[in-house]
C-alpha cells in the first residue's frame, strides 16, 4: 500500500515546527522530510537535523539537475524538498510529512492531488508578533518584513484541507494527531489495509 503524504504550512512565528515535532513524537508512523535551504543556520539549528544547509550555488545546481520534488524562494532564501526524501518512502508504504510553505504545497498538490494538507494560523496578529519577538532571533527590520509576509502567506490558508488555530499548544497538537488518525480510517485506506478481513466478511 502506498504511503500518505502530509503537508503542513504556516507563516513564521505560528509555532508550526513545535506542533509538528510534538505530534510526531506521539506518532511514530510518519517520517518528517528534512528540507534543503540556502540560508545560514540559526544558532540552535543543526545540519541534517533541522535542514540540509547548502550554498545558493549548490541549490541552483540541484534545481538544474531536477533533484527537487518542490522548491520555492522564501524570505529571500531557497527552500526545497529532495525527490529522494519523498518518492521512495511513499512507494514503500511509509507516510511522509513535508513542512513547507504555501508555494511548495501548491507544487506538491499538482503532483500528488490526494496529499493531505494542513495550514496553521495564529489566534491573532498581536499573538503572531509577540511570538516572533520572543524568538529573539531577528532584528526589528526582519520582524516587520516577516509580519508583512505573514499576511500574504495566511491568505492562502483556504487552499488547504484542514485549518488549525494555534491558540493553545496542546490543543493544536491534539488536532493535528486527530487529522492523522482520521486519514488512516478513510474507506480507501482501510479497504487496502484490511482487504482479507473485508473479503471474508462479505463472502456469502
Swiss-Prot record:
Keyword field contains Transferase:
yes
Residues that bind ATP, according to the entry? 10-17
E.C. number: 2.7.4.8
Signal sequence segment: none
List, alphabetically, the InterPro entries matched.
Answer: GK/Ca_channel_bsu (IPR008145), Guanylate_kin-like_dom (IPR008144), Guanylate_kinase (IPR017665), Guanylate_kinase_CS (IPR020590), P-loop_NTPase (IPR027417)
Q: Which Pfam families match?
A: Guanylate_kin
Q: Which positions, given as ranges, span the membrane?
A: none
Q: CDD domains this protein is in?
A: GMPK
The keyword Metal-binding belongs to this UniProt entry's keyword annotation? no
- Stored PROSITE patterns: GUANYLATE_KINASE_1, GUANYLATE_KINASE_2
Name the domain of life this protein comes from.
Answer: Bacteria
Q: Which family does it belong to?
A: Belongs to the guanylate kinase family.
Q: What is this protein called?
A: Guanylate kinase
Q: What organism is recorded for this protein?
A: Xylella fastidiosa (strain Temecula1 / ATCC 700964)
Amino acid at each position: 500500500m502506498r504511503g500518505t503524504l502530509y503537508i503542513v504550512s504556516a507563516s513564521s512565528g505560528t509555532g508550526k515546527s513545535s506542533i509538528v515535532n510534538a505530534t510526531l513524537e506521539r506518532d511514530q508512523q510518519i517520517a518528517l522530510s528534512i528540507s534543503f535551504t540556502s540560508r545560514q543556520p540559526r544558532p540552535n539549528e543543526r545540519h541534517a537535523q533541522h535542514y540540509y544547509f547548502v550554498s545558493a550555488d549548490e541549490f541552483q545546481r540541484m534545481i538544474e539537475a531536477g533533484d527537487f520534488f518542490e522548491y520555492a524562494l522564501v524570505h529571500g532564501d531557497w527552500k526545497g524538498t529532495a525527490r529522494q526524501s519523498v518518492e521512495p518512502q511513499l512507494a514503500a508504504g511509509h507516510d511522509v510529512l513535508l513542512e513547507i510553505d504555501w508555494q511548495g504545497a501548491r507544487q506538491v498538490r499538482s503532483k500528488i492531488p490526494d496529499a493531505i494538507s494542513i495550514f496553521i494560523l495564529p489566534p491573532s496578529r498581536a499573538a503572531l508578533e509577540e511570538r516572533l519577538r520572543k524568538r529573539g532571533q531577528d532584528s526589528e527590520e526582519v520582524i516587520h518584513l516577516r509580519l508583512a509576509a505573514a499576511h500574504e502567506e495566511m491568505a492562502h490558508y483556504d487552499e488547504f484541507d484542514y485549518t488549525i488555530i494555534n491558540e493553545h499548544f496542546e490543543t493544536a497538537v491534539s488536532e493535528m494527531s486527530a487529522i492523522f488518525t482520521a486519514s488512516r480510517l478513510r474507506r480507501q485506506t482501510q479497504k487496502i489495509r484490511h482487504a482479507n478481513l473485508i473479503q471474508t466478511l462479505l463472502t456469502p
